[in-house]
């Protein structure tokens, strides 16, 4: 397949830095929710979500580069990766009575369809799922690009959608609101970083240092989600650019955090909310932070990992099965 990226040469076999950054992103979000420090510190921790978005754009380009991947196969793999753990989380949250909304909101959340707009973005039954809505929107446009055999499709269409949102005004329909939201530009930033890494192999670590410096500056400015691509997304894109292909040592705990990042993100607010039913909100944040990390890691080991292994086995069985 024509990669349509205009890059070639060198593709590292393992992006260790990206893997570590996944864990860092999840830990930042958890620390923010456990402590709510307010001010610049809270906005800096918010950047964990922006880092996730940048990483997603990066990974989608790199993982499909030079491969003949059809749109349906791409969507299936993405849904298998995202939805099963999300459904398990929704079930747990509903049983514990921790979600927001009625049964119809829960049902729509199974398909990651937001029902209300909260803080400028579409919201679902379990609060952290708002980011997955953006992920799915990006995947949908990326899959269309694959159908057209051009991953460059997203570089044109997503910015155009955001421009339409600015020109015409934001929609009151939550899903349409998100489809034109500036946060989608962070996925494009990650995709552009992937082009850079694939083209020049090893961008300088100075990019990461510059990204941290810009984050310190951007965190000083309060603003809605519309300005986050500039104040938080751009710094995170530079961090990803600096660390994506860097040769980093194997650090077991960071690798474990990277492996567990999705479960950590989905599950972390459950132990935090349960703890707050016993202790004052935002108190003993170091304890609730550690508890949430532990629950996320346990969720990865005992739920996510076996589930992914089962899905792989089913795919293998389906691929090898022959009609009688």
Enumerate the language-model features and the residues they cover:
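Structural preference for long, well-ordered alpha-helical segments in enzyme cores
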Residues: 24-27, 78, 140-141, 299
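Functionalized membrane-embedded alpha-helices
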Residues: 22, 79-82, 295, 302
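Short alpha-helix carrying the canonical HExxH Zn2+-binding catalytic motif
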Residues: 20-21, 129, 133-134, 267
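Membrane-interface helix-loop-helix regions
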Residues: 55, 61-65, 76, 82-140, ...
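Loop-to-transmembrane-helix entry motif
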Residues: 78, 82, 86, 260-267
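Structured binding elements
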Residues: 52
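Alpha-helical transmembrane segments in multi-pass integral membrane proteins
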Residues: 2-20, 27-45, 61-73, 115-121, ...
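Membrane-embedded alpha-helical segments of multi-pass transporters/permeases
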Residues: 90, 94-98, 143, 293, ...
């Amino acid at each position: 397949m024509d990669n349509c990226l205009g890059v070639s040469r060198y593709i590292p076999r393992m992006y260790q830095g990206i893997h570590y950054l996944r864990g860092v992103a999840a830990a930042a979000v958890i620390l923010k929710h456990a402590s709510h420090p307010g001010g610049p510190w809270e906005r800096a921790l918010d950047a964990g979500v922006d880092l996730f978005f940048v990483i997603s754009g990066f990974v989608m380009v790199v993982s499909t580069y030079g491969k003949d991947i059809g749109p349906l196969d791409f969507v299936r793999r993405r849904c298998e990766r995202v939805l099963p753990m999300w459904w398990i989380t929704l079930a747990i949250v509903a049983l514990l009575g921790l979600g927001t909304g009625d049964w119809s909101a829960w049902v729509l959340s199974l398909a990651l369809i937001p029902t209300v707009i909260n803080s400028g973005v579409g919201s679902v039954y379990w609060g952290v799922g708002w980011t997955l809505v953006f992920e799915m929107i990006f995947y949908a446009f990326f899959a269309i690009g694959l159908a057209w055999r051009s991953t460059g499709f997203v570089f044109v269409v997503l910015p155009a959608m955001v421009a339409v949102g600015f020109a015409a005004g934001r929609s009151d329909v939550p899903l349409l609101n998100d489809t034109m939201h500036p946060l989608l530009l962070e996925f494009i930033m990650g995709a552009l970083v992937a082009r850079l890494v694939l083209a020049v192999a090893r961008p300088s670590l100075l990019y990461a240092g510059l990204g941290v410096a810009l984050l310190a500056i951007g965190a000083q400015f309060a603003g809605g989600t519309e300005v986050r691509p500039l104040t938080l997304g751009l710094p995170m894109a530079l961090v990803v650019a600096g660390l994506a292909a860097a040769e980093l040592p194997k650090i077991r705990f960071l690798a474990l955090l990277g492996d567990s990042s999705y479960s950590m993100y989905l599950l972390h607010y459950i132990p935090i909310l349960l703890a707050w039913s016993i202790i004052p909100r935002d108190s003993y944040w170091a304890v609730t932070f550690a508890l949430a990390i532990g629950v996320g890691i346990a969720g990865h080991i005992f739920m996510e990992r076996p589930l992914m292994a089962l899905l792989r086995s089913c795919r293998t069985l389906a691929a090898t099965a022959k009609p009688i």
